[in-house]
From Swiss-Prot:
A single MF term (Gene Ontology): microtubule binding
Organism: Caenorhabditis briggsae
Compositional bias ranges of the Polar residues kind: 422-434
GO biological process: cell division; establishment of mitotic spindle localization; meiotic cell cycle; mitotic spindle assembly
Database matches in InterPro entries: ARM-like, ARM-type_fold, CLASP_N_dom, TOG
GO cellular component: basal cortex; centrosome; cytoplasmic microtubule; kinetochore; microtubule organizing center; mitotic spindle; spindle microtubule
UniProt name for this protein: Protein CLASP-2
Principal localisation: cytoplasm
Family statement: Belongs to the CLASP family.
Compositionally biased region (Low complexity): 259-271, 323-334, 372-381
Subcellular localization: Cytoplasm, Cytoskeleton; Cytoplasm, Cytoskeleton, Microtubule organizing center, Centrosome; Chromosome, Centromere, Kinetochore; Cytoplasm, Cytoskeleton, Spindle
Length: 791
């Protein structure tokens, strides 16, 4: 096997790469299989041998080769589906072989797995998902054969097996302690960007961007370089996502990425110096085009760093010069004079000796036209007089900018002037000063194609968050000051809000800082509609802070912040969050923090919730039970009981119907306790005061009641008389004396009639009594007019 140095593990022999694997795929002995049963028996033998790590390593290597031979020679015999069913059984033994400590076994297993991945792709994803962590673990091995075998296996695996499980496994290595694993992850990200299908990439592109962002900030320089390559690949295929990623990093990273863009483009410049294709672009592929194109000499290219050359800019500059009309065509002798400088550019350059005296004098005359002359073609500002007298002013300016005498000598004054204008235009378009020796103006400017979603620079927010959690006191103080400015920005993204909320919660757990409390208040006022998830944890921190703070001044700041929360969030949402916090078994509150919570709940019920708001929910029920358990605690009873009683009174005053319905499900002890509390505190004080009765109205009500009672009594007496008349024998005889009833029923017994009359009288009297009681209750004078039901 040829030993080719892998690009992922630089230096040294005894390393393998992708070409070695491809050559070894078919380098196996032929194995014949006659049927599915025969193939199954052979696979059983393979599994039996490979599953024993103590088996002879030559036998295990042979069995790995047999797997490839069966796949190559026997797929037509037993069918693809049947073969795949047998191959999936090999997942465990192949993983064990990749994990082997002997390099020959590892290399052969990596070749076999890569062969299966290339041939079957996602159909063998079970094997790939099993072997990927093992292959990555081999990257940290110092033995180069083992490390490069594992690295090459990951290349085949990621390229041909495209599943979300594979990508999820890859993301775990972004925080690996081994730099080789992080570096290999960047290489695999290039493969994902280039080879995976767009439908699958669409859902994982944000994660790819985060991984690349992490890579370009890595501590290992080689990992950073691999991350920049992955960024360039992303830029080439998904430019919009690359622009978003570019905008999300800080200025130093942006400069590094722009330099990597220029370096990648200048690589083609360095490789194409003196080559025909690059010259053909500049000369338009014709001798006529070459006449007007100046020589980009090696001295000009050598004085610029490779990362500071933009091929597009050079092409634009030289093309603009080539379009300048020449007043006199060059002779054939001129074309024979070719520059053979080390740079290799072979553009024809005119010399004084080849043009003749007439041409030379014309050049001098044209170059010496005064700038104040009306007929001058020079549109540039007045220049100082030439001190050399040998070169025209345009050439001197170009020479001062480019520093190449061979280049300058090849230009006519018009060409030099046009080139100078092109250079000035390029500098101005890039926003750089006209006279500077800084090469940064040649770096390509990346313009995002889509506007940023947030007005705040993402890198600025991240930097402030990092400063707030820094161990340096000065940096942390500055970060907190900047945080107080950032929290009120209206265009923060949801992720930024989440990160800021976590930082504020962390700062609230430390020593009390008025700036932090003001930041929390501003944060809540500006973004309360999007902080429903933060509210519960934020309230817990505020209650703990209020309970532990001893200084009155700091307590005032805390109360101000809590009032901001009360006035900003929806009261129903606050009630739910407070109840969840109170019943949460994880967030245990100290006794003083419990008091702060009950005070907050009392203010919420009495001052911020509307009368009649429903609260008959399971959260409130659990909260009341929790509060009763707090009030029953003998150790903290004196602190908590008064505030718990206020909460109960507030609930009753808010909605008495829900309060009664809620307590119907409680045990009698709690109901009696609650009613005693309400009676002791006078629950009527929470309800609106009734109108004071006036004497005139009192007399009218009494008169109406008396009239109604008299009418009811008259009705009852008349009804009793009618019933008695109908049931008496005398009345019946009087009614029937004139004629004989043919349908008369036999007379009922007297005792039965008396019982019936008695029951009717009782029912009428009870109805009358209930009616009087109802009238008295509705008029509010039930206490003054008690009805004796025994009467």
């Amino acid at each position: 096997m040829s030993r080719v140095v892998s690009r992922t593990v630089p230096g040294g022999a005894c390393v393998v790469n992708k070409d070695d694997f491809l050559k070894s795929f078919n380098d196996v002995d032929k194995v014949s299989v006659s049927s599915l049963a025969d193939a199954k028996s052979k696979f059983d033998q393979v599994i039996a041998i490979l599953s024993k790590s103590q088996e002879d390593w030559n036998k295990r290597r042979t069995q790995l080769q047999i797997i490839r031979s069966i796949v190559i020679n026997c797929e037509d015999v037993i069918g693809r589906d049947q073969l795949l069913g047998q191959l999936v059984r090999l997942a465990d033994c192949l993983d064990l072989s990749v994990k082997d400590l002997r390099s020959q076994i590892l290399r052969e297993a990596a070749i076999t797995c890569s062969f299966l991945f290339e041939k079957y792709g996602n159909d063998v994803h079970q094997i790939a998902e099993r072997c990927l962590p093992t292959a990555f673990s081999q990257l940290a091995v110092s033995t180069k054969v083992m490390a490069t075998s594992g690295a090459t296996l990951t290349l085949f695996l990621v390229q041909y097996v495209q599943t979300k499980q594979i990508f999820t496994c890859l993301t775990t290595y972004s925080t690996s302690k081994d730099k080789n694993q992080r570096r290999q992850l960047c290489v695999l990200l290039e493969i994902v960007i280039e080879h995976w299908n767009d439908k699958l990439k669409k859902s994982i592109l944000p994660q790819i961007m985060e991984l690349i962002k992490s890579a370009i900030s890595d501590a290992d320089p080689e990992t950073r370089a691999a991350g920049r390559k992955a960024f360039n690949k992303l830029d080439a295929i998904h430019s919009e996502e690359a622009d978003k990623l570019f905008a999300s990093v800080d200025a130093n990273k942006q400069k590094m990425l722009r330099a990597s863009d220029a370096a990648s483009s200048s690589t083609s410049v360095n490789s194409e110096r003196g080559s025909a294709p690059f010259r053909s672009k500049l000369s338009a592929g014709s001798v006529g085009g070459m006449r007007n194109v100046p020589n980009i000499s090696s001295k000009f290219l050598a004085q610029r760093s490779a990362s500071a050359i933009d091929t597009k800019q050079v092409t634009r500059m030289t093309t603009s010069v080539s379009r300048t009309p020449n007043t006199r065509p060059m002779t054939t002798r001129t074309l024979s004079k070719v520059d053979t400088s080390p740079g290799g550019s072979k553009f024809a350059r005119p010399t004084v000796g080849t043009l003749g005296p007439r041409t030379t004098s014309n050049l001098r005359a044209r170059g010496s036209v005064p700038t104040s002359q009306p007929g001058s073609r020079n549109g540039s500002p007045p220049r100082r007089p030439s001190t050399t007298g040998t070169l025209p002013m345009e050439m001197q300016r170009v020479k001062s900018n480019l520093g190449s005498s061979s280049f300058v000598s090849s230009l006519t004054p018009d060409q030099a002037e046009s080139l100078q204008k092109a250079m000035n235009t390029a500098k101005e378009s890039l926003g750089q000063p006209s006279r500077t020796e800084d090469d940064e103006f040649l770096l390509p400017k990346r313009k995002p194609k889509t506007p940023q979603k947030s007005a705040v620079d993402i890198s600025r927010v991240e930097a402030v968050i990092r400063a707030c959690v820094s161990t340096s006191a000065n940096e942390k103080r500055d970060g907190i000051k900047m945080l107080s400015i950032i929290v009120s920005e209206p265009n923060l993204s949801q992720i930024e809000l989440k990160n800021i909320g976590q930082v504020l919660n962390r700062l609230l757990g430390e020593a009390t800082n008025p700036v932090v409390l003001e930041s929390v208040a501003s944060f809540v006022k500006a973004h309360h509609s999007r902080l429903s998830e933060w509210l519960k944890l934020g309230l817990g921190k505020m209650f703990a802070k209020k309970g532990s703070e001893m200084m009155p001044i700091m307590k005032k700041h805390i109360v101000t912040t809590i009032n901001a929360i009360l006035s900003s969030f929806d009261p129903a949402l606050q009630l739910k969050a407070t109840c969840e916090l109170m019943c949460d078994p994880i967030h245990l509150l100290s006794p003083k923090a419990r008091v702060a919570l009950l005070e907050y709940l009392t203010d919420l019920l009495e001052k911020h919730m509307e009368r009649g708001s429903p609260f008959n929910t399971k959260e409130v029920k659990a909260t009341i039970l929790k509060m009763f358990s707090w009030m029953s605690d003998q150790r903290n009873m004196q602190q908590i009981v008064p505030h718990g009683e206020k909460v109960l009174c507030g609930l009753f005053a808010l909605n008495a119907a829900d309060f009664s319905a809620l307590f119907n499900d409680f045990n009698p002890d709690y109901r009696e306790w609650a009613y005693r509390i309400l009676q002791a505190h006078g629950h009527n004080q929470h309800a609106p005061a009734p109108e004071s009765p006036s004497p005139v109205r009192d007399q009218q009500v009494r008169a109406n009641i008396s009239n109604t009672a008299a009418q009811i009594e008259d009705f009852v007496v008349a009804r009793n008389f009618e019933l008695s008349a109908e049931k008496s024998p005398t009345s019946r005889g009087m009614l029937t004396s004139g004629f004989k009833r043919t349908d008369a029923e036999p007379l009922r017994p007297l005792e039965s009639d008396m019982n019936t009359q008695r029951m009717d009288d009782i029912s009428i009297n009870e109805s009358f009594d209930r009616l009087k009681v109802r009238i008295l209750e509705t008029t509010g004078f039930y206490a003054a007019f008690k009805v004796d039901f025994q009467e």
